[in-house]
């Protein structure tokens, strides 16, 4: 999994859900700087955080990390 692809997908999904970095961070019990680091490809979340992100965004883990195209069911 490429950090850059995850970051692009995460930012796209977050923005489609009209969520700020701070709002997403709050749902995950993280700092906003962590979300920023994930989105710009400087940090990689652990599997539990990835799982929670996918649940919040209503997508599969494969869709979040870029292994599968995002489904229309995700509302994106």
Show the residue positions of the predicted features:
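Short, charged recognition helix plus adjacent turn
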Residues: 63-76
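DNA major-groove recognition helix of helix-turn-helix/homeodomain DNA-binding modules
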Residues: 48-63
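Alpha-helical residues within the helix-turn-helix
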Residues: 15, 26, 55
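A detector for short, charged/polar N-terminal pre-domain segments
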Residues: 1-5, 43, 72-74
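Residue-level detection of the helix-turn-helix DNA-binding "recognition helix"
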Residues: 11, 15, 29, 40-42, ...
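A short, Lys/Arg-rich alpha-helix, primarily the initiator
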Residues: 1-16
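Short alpha-helical DNA-recognition segment
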Residues: 18-37
């Amino acid at each position: 999994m490429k950090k850059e692809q995850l970051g692009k997908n995460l930012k796209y999904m977050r923005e489609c859900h009209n969520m700020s970095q701070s709002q997403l961070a709050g749902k995950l019990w993280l700092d906003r700087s962590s979300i920023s680091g994930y989105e710009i490809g400087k940090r990689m979340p652990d599997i539990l955080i990835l799982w929670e992100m996918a649940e919040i965004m209503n997508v599969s883990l494969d869709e979040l990390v870029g292994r599968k195209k995002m489904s229309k069911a995700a509302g994106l």
